[in-house]
């Protein structure tokens, strides 16, 4: 075996878009449901791990075999999730040097960063199945307990056998579509230097950055206390039920002789230059509330892994054609501005 194309379907109660794949795969309830693969471009097989099937020994061995190149669309997801599946400790991941990402290849050719989008632009015969989004929502995320579902918080294969069969077909089609993307782009290879940069990028993302969680949590707590104090001061000054309401604040200002169409940052700064008291004080308090933002600290708290490090902060080739990386989660490139 020289190459192994992989696509997996997973379950985790952690919100992937908010916490990133590293934290997502650390969730105690994380598991790989389906493992779709093709060895050396051969027939696609789907291993139903959720229903008790096991990876064939040769496939399991290939995951750590440096002689086998592993391919996936957004390979970072598969690599990190499979690292947890194989029982590697937090902070240890499968070697990115053994992986290639067809999403990076597509981006280098100016194609969309989604498998569905890339397949559509390339006009592939086997497109990504559109029903996948609903199936992922059904099987891969927690569900709300209702009378209709007997109060369960997770949908399993036995709860909808027909949907599960469709989900397996979806998984197989993803592998086929990913291989079709590779085949279509084979005449336009990515320079080896790009794959070397990709490996370095993955090592940086795997290593992450240590966070001072005491500082993070205290900053969030201080912000909450400050917002309570500022809001209380505004209520006392304006006698409004909700002084944070733009409409209520604009009406209060108008009733006190100060008309304005907007309470944007620049508009408030201009109004403060001429506003009489107590209008000036109210605008000053509102400006302080607007400045108070700890979203970056909240993002840190959401994304931090069990060992106190935040990972997956950068996406390689986040911008098509130019190849510029893109910030993710905490947006660390903005720290000097914050």
Model-identified regions with their sequence ranges:
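Active-site-proximal helix-loop-helix substrate-binding element of RNase H-like nuclease domains
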Residues: 27-37, 41-186
């Amino acid at each position: 075996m020289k190459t192994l194309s992989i696509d997996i379907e997973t379950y985790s109660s952690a919100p992937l878009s908010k916490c990133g794949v590293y934290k997502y795969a650390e969730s105690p309830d994380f598991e790989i449901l389906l493992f779709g693969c093709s060895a050396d471009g051969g027939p696609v097989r789907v291993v139903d791990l959720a229903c008790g099937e096991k990876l064939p020994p040769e496939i399991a061995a290939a995951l750590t075999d440096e002689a086998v190149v592993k391919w996936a669309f957004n390979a970072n997801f598969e690599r990190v999730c499979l690292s947890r599946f194989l029982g590697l400790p937090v902070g240890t991941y499968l070697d990115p040097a053994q992986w290639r990402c067809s999403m990076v290849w597509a981006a280098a050719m100016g194609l969309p960063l989604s498998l569905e989008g890339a397949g559509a632009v390339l006009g592939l015969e086997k497109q990504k199945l559109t029903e996948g989004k609903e199936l992922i929502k059904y099987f891969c995320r927690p569900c709300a307990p209702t009378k209709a579902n007997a109060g369960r918080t997770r949908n399993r294969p036995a709860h909808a056998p027909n949907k599960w069969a469709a989900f397996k077909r979806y998984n197989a089609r993803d592998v086929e579509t990913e291989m079709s993307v590779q085949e279509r782009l084979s005449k336009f290879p990515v320079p080896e230097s790009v794959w070397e940069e990709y490996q370095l990028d993955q090592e940086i993302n795997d290593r992450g950055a240590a966070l001072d969680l005491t500082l993070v949590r205290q900053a969030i707590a201080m912000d909450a206390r400050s917002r309570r104090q500022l809001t209380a001061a505004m209520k006392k000054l304006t006698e409004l039920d909700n002084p944070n309401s733009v409409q209520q604040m604009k009406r209060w200002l108008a009733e006190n002789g100060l008309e304005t169409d907007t309470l944007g940052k620049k508009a408030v700064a201009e109004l403060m230059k001429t506003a009489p008291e107590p209008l000036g004080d109210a605008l000053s308090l509102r400006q302080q509330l607007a400045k108070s933002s700890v979203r970056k600290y909240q993002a840190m708290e959401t994304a931090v892994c069990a060992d106190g490090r935040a990972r997956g902060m950068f996406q390689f080739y986040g911008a098509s054609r130019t190849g510029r990386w893109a910030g993710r989660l905490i947006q660390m490139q903005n720290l000097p501005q914050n």
